[in-house]
Amino acid sequence: MGNKRYTGNWNSVNTHTVPEWYEDCKFGIFIHWGIYSVPAFAPHTWELGEVDSKEWFADNPYAEWYYNSLNIGKGPTYKHHIEKYGKDFKYEDFIPMWKAENWDPKQWAEIFKEAGAEYVVLTTKHHDGFCLFPSKYTHFNSVEMGPKRNITGELTEAVRNAGIRMGLYYSGLIDWQYANDPIFEDDDLFGTASPTFAYADYSYNQMNELVDDYAPSVFWNDIGWPKQSEEMMPYFLSHYYNKVPEGVVNDRFNDRYHDFLTKEYKSGSVNRKEKWEMCRGMGLSFGYNANEGDDKLISVPDLISLLVGTVANNGNLLLNIGPKADGTIPEEQVKRLKILGAWLKVNHDGIYGTRCSDRESEMLENGIELHYTQKEGNLNVFADHLKEGANEFLIKGYHGQLRPFDPSVKVETTDTEEGLLVKIPEYRKELYVVGLTNKL
């Protein structure tokens, strides 16, 4: 893969394959941090994909969409803004308030490492158009305004020094500095919010700038690719793959090409036959939302269940953190990362470097859910939704041995005609999902 050259056409680009590292890594950290982290407000409503888009945008739970929610001119975010800041206070007036005075990129990288993350994806430019990197093409960036720091550069260095791969998010289709008509529904994403020819050139240049300056392992585009420059997409991808031969891109450029599919909360269609990635926030927002206290975030059991179920079905989990404007990660988010990291440390061999098994995930009649992964010919079984105390379940058609990844877990097995009967006589809720393997 390293000696191959891509030549700016679709036939060449289509020869790129998903690198082993992305198949192996399983868990990454998404970061949404920007101007929107100052107001840090959105209503706590529903997950993406749960309701019709018109209803969703009216009460948008994404704090990073504050600009659009304000621009709509009604709804909870608009009301909050008028009451707290006044009708003459513009979104851009938040920029001097974003100081990132307590930001330590090395500390962030240490937290990600402890959490077990194998890659990180930073929002270098979200839909508001504010860039977290110095750019030849705009002064609207975090080096010349706000924090006065190259957030992308500093974090990339810290993350890589921690032995973690660095990826970059870029809002390819939407930039409210170029087209800022309010978005009321999904159709507006590709209609009233469609960019100009000037923006198509701008985004193409900035994408190449990010590739040249940071060589990201993941290029995570969002919403789409400007229709005014569709013919330039294979040139960009060729440039990226020539610069980063083992790089990967998601499915949000257009319908024609991707290395992996994406699912966001309940939105998106994926299957276990093709590599995919689940992304979601700790709560219902990606950007920090001061409305979301500890009780509004995903529980630790649900988080570990999400990771296991995703990995067992050929996915990676890209879990978002939403830092505060001062650069600190909220303690309730850090707490979840640490617990997840501790669980991954114990169950490491059943997650990283695995592939989905021929055995598909199954929900048993007793409410226990079984997930399967395989690695180097070994079978791994994860038992979820166990109850406190004694539990038992049957793995149909399997007649081998199993041992727990966690040596503190007592497991009894009996080979029966139907399969292996597994008993866990003393389950404790702090074990969360119990991992088993036939690797001796």
Each language-model region and where it sits:
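Mature catalytic domains of secreted/periplasmic carbohydrate-active enzymes
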Residues: 1-440
